[in-house]
A protein has these predicted regions:
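Eukaryote-biased, non-catalytic alpha-solenoid scaffold regions
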Residues: 2-180
């Protein structure tokens, strides 16, 4: 009984999901012996392991969203986008062609979570503006501009439109149309 109580009483509040997600990318990028068992080390990242671990975190984020734990959901979604952007490698271009195993799927999942968070009644205005602020920083990561794995600008526009009053949203759309 104690184990079940202890497990159910533990919350996500004490966990730093941002650090835990970044650790995944850091720990599976270390040198290991190559598969040819020669004296050269293989410094490539084990992407399959990274993405298997990311699956777990994104499932946690879905669960936290269903519980109304917006902070944990936001932390996981934003760190997913940041870590993928900061750790993207050219070899992933070939992996991304596989529909079941690609960075864009993880980015889309994280972006979808953020859209659900923004539309959730428990989400505060401060959380919404914090999301936008961090997305602006993430959008500056060159990976998103150079490789087109995910359109962060589109996500920011959707979030902006959903949190603005109708008049402001129309002004924003007009401004975007003028710049294009």
């Amino acid at each position: 009984k104690r184990f079940i109580f202890k497990e159910s009483s533990s919350t996500s509040k004490g966990k730093d999901y941002r650090t835990e997600i970044q650790k995944i990318f850091n720990s599976f990028g270390d040198s290991k012996k190559s598969r040819y068992h020669n004296r050269y080390n293989d410094y490539s990242r084990d992407w399959e392991t990274v993405f298997n671990r990311m699956d777990v975190f994104l499932k946690k984020a879905d669960f936290f969203l269903s519980l109304g734990d917006m902070d944990s959901t936001i932390a996981i979604a934003l760190q997913t986008l940041r870590s993928i952007g900061e750790n993207y490698e050219d070899e992933l271009l070939y992996i991304d062609d596989d529909d079941d195993f690609g960075t864009s799927l993880y980015c889309e999942h994280a972006g979808g979570l953020l859209m659900k968070v923004v539309g959730h009644p428990k989400t505060t205005q401060k959380q919404k503006t914090d999301i936008l602020q961090e997305l602006r920083q993430i959008a500056e990561i060159s990976t998103y501009r150079n490789y087109g794995i995910y359109d962060i600008d589109e996500l920011m526009m959707q979030i902006n439109l959903s949190i603005q009053p109708t008049e402001k949203a129309l002004e924003l759309i007009d401004g975007l149309l003028e710049t294009r």
